[in-house]
From Swiss-Prot:
The keyword Cytoplasm applies. It holds the Pfam family PID. It comes from Mus musculus (Mouse). It is found in: Cytoplasm; Cytoplasm, Perinuclear region; Nucleus. The modification Phosphoserine is found at S82, S246, S250, S252, S267, S284, S289, S317, S372, S406, S408, S413, S573. Residues 106-115, 240-258, 392-403 have a biased composition (Basic and acidic residues). This is Amyloid-beta A4 precursor protein-binding family A member 1. Residues 1-121, 238-349, 366-439 are annotated as: Disordered. Residues 631-648 are annotated as: Autoinhibitory helix linker.
């Protein structure tokens, strides 16, 4: 909406049907003299030989005698007025809210070329789903043009027809219609009455019988009430829609949270929003004035109905008038004329007041910056809401850090880090009060639970900056969940690739075109939302990764490796293979983007990123109404300090009678005849266990070894902490010896576990898959209780779970509280003892 006075032709874009208010009001701004003084043009004479009919199609009685020519002239003017008005109401389309609708002007074609740029900037495309409705409107426009050829006929516009037209557009909020005047139609006041835009037009031609006029009046009153209710409902819906989208947002933290993920618009989009707000203000204020006029209208009409008729009030009196057009006229009734003039004056006063308010609102919009309801201001203080991931290209301007912002004296951020938090409007008290109210409405949780790390949690919310040198980036293919050792190997490979590329670049006099020079100075921006790499000089974002895509961070000396995950696109053949083999889902390859930096604060950078994950997790808990203290690490550590290590293994190993040196005699070239398995990660002394012995072999014939015995050393060589393959190689090397010395600890094949879990809030600290313990949390209550990775659970609290389904085992463990007694066995030993695997003796 760049100007109020503009075109003569109605610009039909996709505007809400509330737009007719804009058109009518702007028409008044341009032609105030039309509303007050212009008279409608006389109607064209009826065709020769055509007899006028009443509204039911019966021939009308002959015209009155010549002395009543003035009355007929007045009725002719009224008929022309109603005919033009009715044809106008049959020509309407819907346009979208916020477009410009201007009144008529003869020089429109000359101005159209000058305003081409404005039209291209502010034009709104048609709604694709409204095509069916537009076609119906055009068809009705043709029908109305045909009906104008018979000005002496009465054309009924029923509510059922309107509802049928709205069937294809029923999903939209607004239901008002626009007046669209044909280009060749002479100007006649289309909005003589702003209070009844959808009332029906009836005209009495000649002296109709009193009974028919009375029936027409009753029909008019009934349909007028229905149209008024329909209009008020639609108008109320539009006002309610406007209030929901604008007025209620700045006062409600829930609304702020709802619109928080939207990115900030550039200047072009802000201009569009200002124009849209102006349109909404005009519609709202004009509609209020029209609503008031609609409320006052029934009183005036009641006065007209109670006015004395020339026949003395008899119902069959031939002088009973029928309503003419949108404005009631009583022929030959002075009292009725005065009432109509008074009502018309009140109407003009209400419209003038609305125009004045609109002008003031427009001036206020021009002189004051208005925040669009779709781009709420960023808060100066963090508001605890769950945030959605936004595209890096859309919101990089929102979180772009500013140089020179050092951390506050009381901040616990590291010396190498700078805080990037600055208020958008430092002197705006409204924003500060809104933020305070938002914080009061949140759960009364502590601000932060202590999170280990070098930074203050509040600084991580706003973002901190580290200075670094960008060395380069490379891509690696990785599994979905590789181990830490694999991650470190990938990080080292990325560093070696970058250093090799640097050496090649140094060997050349000039780097190839399109390849960045090494050692670019950058600012590494770290927050709970994302990690950005900014050019130190221009502050332009070079890389931007949401925090949730960061899979690994490693510091190797003064080198920092940042690894971000990206899904590798798959070909059709790969998709077909995975569709036929769902088990291959975990084997998908992922692209890992590895960025390599050099910084003196490499360790601080890695620790800060790890701390950002912890603070982001607390944000998630608070947004879901969970007190972070309920799951704090401190409380869990206090629980561990109250528990003693389950020391049955330690006591067993410390007893001298359980530790023995065993000598095995055998023939040279003969194998020892044993099967060994790992004791399992989490045991007191990680070593190998005898899982099976060959029948008739040297180990079995000696009678000194049992299944479950742990081998500490062989011929003075310790096996503690060695990989299983190494231990197997050592035993295989005994083939040429005739005497073997083994140091063993006698242990039962089944291990006893005791877990103390005081409450369901505390996790057990291990995971189970098909009855086998596959992972264990270091330092948790499960490790203290003697749980070992690679063991199969045999028994839980005295109940055997050997043949129990996996889901039931998980259910039992999840609901177990107090002391949990379990018996486990190495899974490989279990398979050998149950003949699920064939032993391979060494």
């Amino acid at each position: 909406m760049n100007h109020l006075e503009g075109s003569a032709e109605v610009e039909v874009a996709d505007e809400a049907p509330g737009g007719e208010v804009n058109e009518s009001v702007e028409a008044d701004l341009e032609h105030p003299e039309v509303v007050e003084g212009q008279q409608p043009s006389p109607s064209p004479p009826p065709p020769a030989g055509h007899e006028p009919e009443d509204h039911r199609g019966h021939p009308a009685p002959p015209p009155p005698p010549p002395p009543q020519e003035e009355e007929e002239e007045e009725r002719g003017e009224c008929l022309a007025r109603s005919a033009s008005t009715e044809s106008g109401f049959h020509n309407h389309t819907d346009t979208a809210e916020g477009d410009v609708l201007a009144a008529a002007r003869d020089g429109y074609e000359a101005e159209r070329a000058q305003d081409a740029d404005d039209e291209s900037a502010y034009a709104v495309q048609y709604r694709p789903e409204a095509e069916e409705y537009t076609e119906q409107a055009e068809a009705e426009h043709v029908e109305a043009a045909q009906r104008r050829a018979l000005p002496n006929h009465l054309h009924f516009h029923s509510l059922e027809h309107e509802e049928a037209m709205n069937a294809a557009y029923s999903g939209y909020v607004y239901t008002h219609r626009l007046f669209h005047r044909a280009e060749d139609e002479p100007y006649a006041e289309p909005y003589a009455d702003y209070g009844g835009l959808q009332e029906h037009v009836y005209e009495e031609i000649g002296d109709a019988p009193e009974l028919e006029a009375r029936d027409g009046l009753r029909l008019y009153e009934r349909e007028r009430d229905e149209a008024a209710a329909y209009r008020q409902e639609a108008l109320g819906a539009r006002l309610h829609h406007y209030d929901e989208r604008s007025d209620g947002e700045s006062d409600s933290p829930e609304k702020e949270a709802e619109f928080a993920p939207y990115p900030r618009m550039d200047s072009y989009e802000q201009e569009e929003d200002i124009d849209q707000i102006v349109a909404e203000v005009k519609q709202s204020m004009s509609s209020q004035s029209l609503d008031k006029a609609a409320e006052d209208m029934p009183e005036a009409e009641q006065d007209l109905e109670r006015a004395p008729t020339p026949g003395g009030g008899h119902p069959d009196s031939p002088g009973l008038p029928a309503p003419a057009g949108q404005q009631q006229r009583v022929v030959g009734t002075p009292g009725g004329s005065e009432v109509g003039q008074r009502y018309s004056k009140e109407k003009r006063d209400a419209i003038s007041l609305a125009i004045k308010d609109i002008k003031e609102a427009i001036e206020e919009v021009k002189t004051r910056t208005i925040r669009s309801p779709y781009t709420p201001d960023e808060p100066k203080e963090p508001i605890w809401v769950m945030r959605q991931d936004i595209s890096p290209t859309r919101d990089c301007d929102d979180q772009r850090p500013v140089d020179g912002d050092s951390p506050s004296p009381g901040s616990s951020s590291p010396l190498g880090a700078e805080s990037s938090s600055i208020p958008l409007h430092p002197g705006d008290p409204t924003e500060a009060s809104t933020n305070k109210e938002s914080r009061k409405s949140l759960a009364s949780f502590p601000t932060y639970v202590e999170v280990p790390g070098p930074c203050d949690p509040e600084d991580l919310i706003d973002g901190i900056i580290f200075a670094a040198n960008y060395l380069g980036s490379t891509q690696l293919l990785s599994d979905k969940t590789p181990s830490k050792n694999v991650r470190m190997m990938q990080a080292q490979e990325a560093v070696s690739r970058i250093k090799t590329a640097q050496k090649l670049a140094k060997s050349r006099k000039k780097a190839p075109e399109g390849e960045s020079q090494p050692m670019t100075e950058v600012d590494l921006f770290i927050s709970t939302q994302r990690i950005k790499v900014l050019n130190a000089d221009t502050q332009e974002p070079m890389m931007d990764h949401p925090l949730r895509t960061i899979s690994y961070i490693a510091d190797i000396g003064n080198i920092v490796v940042l690894m971000a995950r990206r899904r590798m696109p798959r070909s059709n053949s790969q998709e077909n293979v995975e569709a036929s083999h769902p088990s291959q889902d975990g084997k998908r390859q992922y692209k890992m983007i590895c960025h390599v930096f050099e910084s003196e604060d490499a360790q601080l950078i890695a620790q800060s990123i790890g701390q950002a994950f912890s603070v982001a997790y607390q944000e998630f808990l608070r947004a879901n109404g969970i007190n972070p203290e309920d799951l704090s690490q401190k409380e869990y550590s206090d629980l561990l300090n109250t528990q003693d290590m389950y020391n049955d293994d330690l006591i067993h190993f410390s007893k001298s009678e359980n530790c023995k040196d065993v000598f095995i005699e055998k023939q040279k070239g003969e194998i020892l005849g044993v099967v060994i398995v790992e004791s399992g990660w989490g045991s007191i002394l990680p070593t190998v266990i005898i899982a099976n012995m060959m029948h008739g072999g040297p180990a079995e014939k000696s009678g000194k070894l049992n299944i479950g015995d742990q081998i500490m050393s062989i011929n003075g060589t310790s096996l503690v902490g060695l990989p299983l393959s190494t231990c197997q190689s050592i035993i295989k090397g005994l083939k040429n010896q005739s005497r073997v010395k083994l140091n063993i600890v006698r242990c039962p094949p089944v291990t006893t576990v005791l877990i103390r879990r005081p409450d369901l809030r505390y996790q057990l600290g291990f995971s189970v898959q098909n009855g086998i313990i596959c992972s264990l949390m270091r330092g948790g209550i499960a490790e203290r209780g003697g749980v070992r990775v690679g063991h199969r659970i045999i028994e839980i609290n005295g109940q055997s779970v050997v043949a129990t389904p996996h889901e039931k085992i998980v259910h039992i463990l999840s609901n177990a509280v107090g002391e949990i007694h379990m018996k486990t066995m190495p899974a490989a030993m279990y398979r050998l003892l149950t003949a699920q695997e064939q032993p391979v003796y060494i």
